[in-house]
């Protein structure tokens, strides 16, 4: 290509100019035959696939440089840390506009991770960082695996800065030079909110992300709402016994006033989980809990056990392909769980739940679809306590009903819950101005007994809402209209809540 600006003319007063630009495009070149010279050490097909070239792709100096970088990164991903790639491309050798390109590949030795050296630890135990990268030692160098481990460490919140540099430490060995600056480990946080069902709420959380200098978080949280009080002590070990498994141990106590009764609960929950892939997490849990139900406004014959000990064990798994956990704009998540309580003959049941959510952005608008179901199966003559039953209706289920108001009720209108439920949601969110957005939605769901599992007696809701976007999720105001009211139903319900409905 040639550019000619000789036609430029300056005005008589010298304050302006007429600029004439003549462009001669010249011949058009495309990428021609690709060859590999030197000592590639890999099959040609594998190298071509790594380049991911399109047919008759344009030939430009930038395109050639990008191909060189891509090939070098590919070799490094296979452990060839010092791979050298030279490009030979000469337009004078072009035939019919196609320029042949030769890559001279000298991968060198395949490197493995050797030692890990951490610098900058203060409150953290010096061995902490070495143990976090220990599983990589002795293995072939892989930048992607190293990046994943780096991101895992950043998410702990333990570091103000973290740099991980592979440094050659022998003919085929790399040393990981880890340089850190620790963040403040101790924290205190406060929260204040309001929800349609819980009313005004407030809370305080005190935590130490570096408990006993081992990088494990311990926190105490106290929460109050107009429905009651809850205290919780939580210990998390993301690497129990320095493995890939995570332990969550929680001790809690709560006092709540529900519709038709009050309850006090003390319990312990232990959960063990592991991420087997970046998108699949699975685990198991056990729960021990004592509960006392009091201040009954419901006939005791409809409530089930009012004082019991829950001892349950269960399995869970999550497939999460969302692009953002708190504010997704694409992807889907599937969560399932199943547990069993059969140690106490008065309280014996099996329970299973499933939840699926899908998100897709269309420009600045967002379509969300959701489906949920749960089933509790009593064992023998056991009754399910009212507080362990499923409920439906509210800000995250069928929004044409107030909280827990969909389903069986006693003569006074108190919800009784059920052993099988479904919820289906569809919502379209759209921008209005700035952080303010709107929504239209439709919901459906039902609530039935354990022996009457079906999609009969579905209840529906259609509605509109407002959304105010925050970095951690939206504040929601919704009104759901009931298009098929039955005796005792209200025409609809307002909801004020935080986060996504499903």
Protein language model features and the residues they cover:
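Transmembrane beta-strand segments that form the barrel wall of outer-membrane beta-barrel proteins
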Residues: 133, 185-196, 202-210, 214-225, ...
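C-terminal outer-membrane beta-barrel translocator/porin domains of Gram-negative envelope proteins
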Residues: 155, 187-190, 285-287, 294-435, ...
